[in-house]
């Protein structure tokens, strides 16, 4: 990893998210996909995923222009050695991070790289996400947790658009999705929610409860459609008008999150390469 001094720009810099507990459900920063499957092949989704290391923080991001990646704000410390590698394999080379721009209120950050990516970049999903839509989560958490050399992906079904989730930031507006064929466990923070191969959300939190088998079976995503103007302003990315309207907002404390049945980790790895059970 290259050593780099980078600058952080924001209207306000808030503390990184920390684990929170509450009856029935708690949400904490999401970190690795376990019991999932490899992100493979040459495609927009595999080519645009980013492995981020800034200070002692390991996260995931997504290339949305040749020089800009989007991730979660809580992934960005105030200083430290900063590097990013583009692509779904650890064979990808790290490059330094030039700067990070933090969203003033949402758990979003933009990370600028000095060299243009030669691989694909991903477009934003062209509509506001609605309950019942299906997508894929992807992330690099398995690299730190299990030594997996390939980014992992699982399936997500959006359940609700929520606020007041038991977490450090109860004002956050989030897409709540149940995870199947894998689960979020610690490095996937900031990773993408893809719908039809386009970026619909950025992972902010996942379930963190007393039963470890339930951890990571629900993820909360920042809906990028609701922040398209901010993204376009700083990156220069052309974003077409977003279709539809945001889904009804549900109070997640008054209407607690349903946590799916446990999904214990049953995958394995050979030589560091992940082998999912599905």
Swiss-Prot record:
This is Uncharacterized peptidase cgR_1176. Residues 1-32 form the signal peptide. Belongs to the peptidase S1 family. GO terms for cellular component: extracellular region. Gene3D superfamilies: Trypsin-like serine proteases. Its main location: secreted. InterPro entries: Peptidase_S1, Peptidase_S1_PA, Peptidase_S1_PA_chymotrypsin, Peptidase_S1A, Trypsin_dom. Pfam families: Trypsin (PF00089). Keywords: Disulfide bond, Hydrolase, Protease, Secreted, Serine protease, Signal. GO terms for molecular function: serine-type endopeptidase activity. One of its GO terms (biological process) is proteolysis. The active site is at 74 (charge relay system), 123 (charge relay system), 189 (charge relay system). It is found in: Secreted. It comes from the Bacteria. SUPFAM superfamilies: Trypsin-like serine proteases.
């Amino acid at each position: 990893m290259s050593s780099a001094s980078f600058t952080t720009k924001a209207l306000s810099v808030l503390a990184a998210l920390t684990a929170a507990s509450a009856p029935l459900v708690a949400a904490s920063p999401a970190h690795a996909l376990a019991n999932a499957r490899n992100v493979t092949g040459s495609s927009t989704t595999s080519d645009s995923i980013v492995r981020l290391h800034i200070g002692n923080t390991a996260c995931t991001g997504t290339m949305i222009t040749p020089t800009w990646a989007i991730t979660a704000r809580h992934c960005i410390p105030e200083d430290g050695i900063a590097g990013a590698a583009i692509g779904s394999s650890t064979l990808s080379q790290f490059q330094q991070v030039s700067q990070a721009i933090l969203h003033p209120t949402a758990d979003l950050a933009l990370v600028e790289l000095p060299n243009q990516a030669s691989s694909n970049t991903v477009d934003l999903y062209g509509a506001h996400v609605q309950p019942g839509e299906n997508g894929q989560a992807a992330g690099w958490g398995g690299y730190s947790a299990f030594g997996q050399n390939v980014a992992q992906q699982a399936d997500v079904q959006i359940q609700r658009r929520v606020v007041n989730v038991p977490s450090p930031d109860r004002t956050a507006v989030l897409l709540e999705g149940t995870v199947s064929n894998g689960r979020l466990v610690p490095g996937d923070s900031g990773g993408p929610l893809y719908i039809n191969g386009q970026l619909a959300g950025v992972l902010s939190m996942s379930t963190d409860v007393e039963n470890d088998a339930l951890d990571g079976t629900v993820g909360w995503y920042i809906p990028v459609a609701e922040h398209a103007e901010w993204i376009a302003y700083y990156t220069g990315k052309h974003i077409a008008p977003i279709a539809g309207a945001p889904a009804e907002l549900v109070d997640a404390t008054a209407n607690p999150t349903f946590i799916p049945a446990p999904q214990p980790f049953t995958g394995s790895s050979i030589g560091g390469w992940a082998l999912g059970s599905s």
